[in-house]
């Protein structure tokens, strides 16, 4: 504490004292309530023990200013209201003094701000400017400490988070950033400026209030620090997209990658869905008049749908009611409570009613009281928390076996597929995700029977803890009453708690496995989308086939269709068709053939390989490659394909799509629904809503970071840019067709439906080619003297005027755009243009040197002289924003980071499966990545499998170790053959290295 400022010290100490004496006051108030309410019984969290509390120390007013003294007292305004766990007490849902405390907190913050302003006003202007960043940093630290001390959360630097928090490694442009130098927090979106967080930083007010803090639960489930979760929630609440956050707000999320950010977003949506479901269920039960205080408390504590189902199932419409409900209707709840509160005065014989069913005998009375007690135990939060924590440290396994069904009902092939799981048992902490998905599929097909097994020691320790601690009667209980209590515990565990735990374990395992499967699908899709393009080539696309022939399509280097045809290579006409193929290749000077991997792919590949080996296509040096044709047939009959290639046969459209997948994979694959690309694992078994949301987000991420040229890109590609959708993309294309090309980014504000938020999200990912604009401007100037709506001057700034559109009210639009801005061809966001201009002035550069070697030399020399931190401090910005500016100024205009990824593997010959031998070293291309291994195409017609145990970090390069750039489709690898199973066509490989 010695390193803290004086104000921070006083506040932290004050909070500790308040927390200590608040617990003392709660105990004393609880004892007073017990005396007043005839000693109402409640479950005991700990063994009763006499404890002395030290008297509170009164602080001296002279040593502590009034603001500091009140700070700890009003800090509760940011805390989540805690509901007391009492069976007979009213549920506190809202704090009546909450608003007053918030008002006091705002007053204190206002006083601090005013005091800071007075100090700054007393300093000279030059001094204030040089020390501004330092003051902001100190204030940010003090605010962070104050916020942490006022909340119930553990600070991010404590040992609790030390072993669990995600730590991202330094990354390149694609995973977007390096580790931040410090944690900078903000309540609003910064404009490239260093920011600070308010005192109640970790408090997020949700529309639906629960008894748990959404920030804390989100942090626990994702293993991400609370301050990062708070920032992320605020960013998502402000409608920021993942690409925008990753590139331009990375200091607020501690450099998380896109996959981690998507995980936070999905978990946040799940928690909010649970909260909404809880409150809708509460309203339904209230209308039926079945709501009680204990039920309300239990429902507001629910964090999952399984917990809510467990609590609310007996109260659903049409339910026959539980055994406990029927016992309560008979009036036995008083007997059950008396057993815990006043066992010495309880007489079960007084409840006997010979003419009432369920009360006719003493045994009926005991069973009814037992059912009520079992229900109370199974719905008590403290009890459920204890049993869950107990299971985490004990042996809990999942078992699967062959289902006892007749062979007529189950396909024998399905039984053979699940041979590994017919006698399977594994600890739930060690089981793999793909095993869970396989077991679930077998269970759905009625092939397997699955159960969760909890060791008997868990039950014994649970019952012992309940008797001695949580559910111990207040006074001495007779042996027959203790027998009822023990029977209640056994009944509660066996009939209620055990099934609940099994459902929770299965649901958690399935949820985690589905999420990992979806994440793997997303990573594979990213690798495919970011495959390096092959520009500047004329390509022949081949869609193989037998009876209907092989469809051919030749496209130009600009993706224009030059020729289409059909050849029959596998119907005895191979020699005749070879001459036609040769003439086509020679006429269009095409030396690259792209073959789809569908039906007849192997035979078509052998056909072309044989002709190439015979040098049949001389003087052309022809090569070929195999590309996935997944989704090509679906796209060929879609309305978009009909609009793009009208009048062309759908089969020939597939050949065109296959060729374009090599020329520009991203531009072609975005036309296909992601789930049809087919690079996943169990993708048809997982939540389709989650799968679609994740894959759409991955497509948006890839398209945004590659960037698009607004004046030549297609509508299909444009709709996947962050902040845009189908309607906005359509409006942009219509504006471009009506008014000509966009001169700079500011003109986007004139497009219908593109508001300030949409412009903020998309502007940094839209590029404007300056050479194209200069050519267009010169042509327009020669013909008409002035570009429509654009006056060209020497200024680099932009003036905005109001343009009235009829009688309707219109937004302020850019009517006069003074000239093209060279910064519009970079990844620099318009909000940082002012900082970029000041940086250029500092290094002595100009806008016309962007992307040139001279600019790179000036930047390097300036960085060596000053350093990143000093430059960022001088420009009053963050290091991350400065890095984006440096990258934007250094990268050439034609920069495409996809060139760092692997290109298609072009071949001239073919290898057969029979030619392989154990120990042979081959090079191949990753075809698919799953949770259990990597499938590699080694050119023998059947993919080999690298088991996941053979993919170690030592064999991966530094960039491949990152989660977002894991080994995936398109990667070239060197492998060694470990085993060959020719009858089953299986090849086992070992990874040597990544090429």
UniProtKB/Swiss-Prot annotation:
Pfam families found in the cross-reference section: HHH_3, HHH_9, S1, Tex_central_region, Tex_N, Tex_YqgF
SMART domains to which the protein is assigned, alphabetical: S1, YqgFc
UniProt xrefs under InterPro entries: HHH_9, NA-bd_OB-fold, Ribos_protein_bS1-like, RNaseH-like_sf, RuvA_2-like, S1_domain, S1_Tex, Tex-like_central_region
Keywords for this protein: Coiled coil, Isopeptide bond, Phosphoprotein, RNA-binding, Ubl conjugation
Covalent cross-link Glycyl lysine isopeptide (Lys-Gly) (interchain with G-Cter in SUMO2), where: 84, 134, 166-167, 183, 185, 955
Region (Disordered): 23-78, 116-164
Basic residues biased stretches: 116-132
Cross-link (Glycyl lysine isopeptide (Lys-Gly) (interchain with G-Cter in SUMO1)): 185
Entry keyword annotation includes Protein biosynthesis: no
Highest taxon above the source species: Eukaryota
GO biological process: nucleobase-containing compound metabolic process; translation
NAD in keyword set: no
Regions annotated as coiled coil: 258-288
GO molecular function: mRNA binding; structural constituent of ribosome
Residues found modified as Phosphoserine: 861, 964
Record field: compositional bias (Low complexity): 146-159
Residue intervals of the S1 motif domain: 919-992
Protein name: S1 RNA-binding domain-containing protein 1
Recorded name of the encoding gene: SRBD1
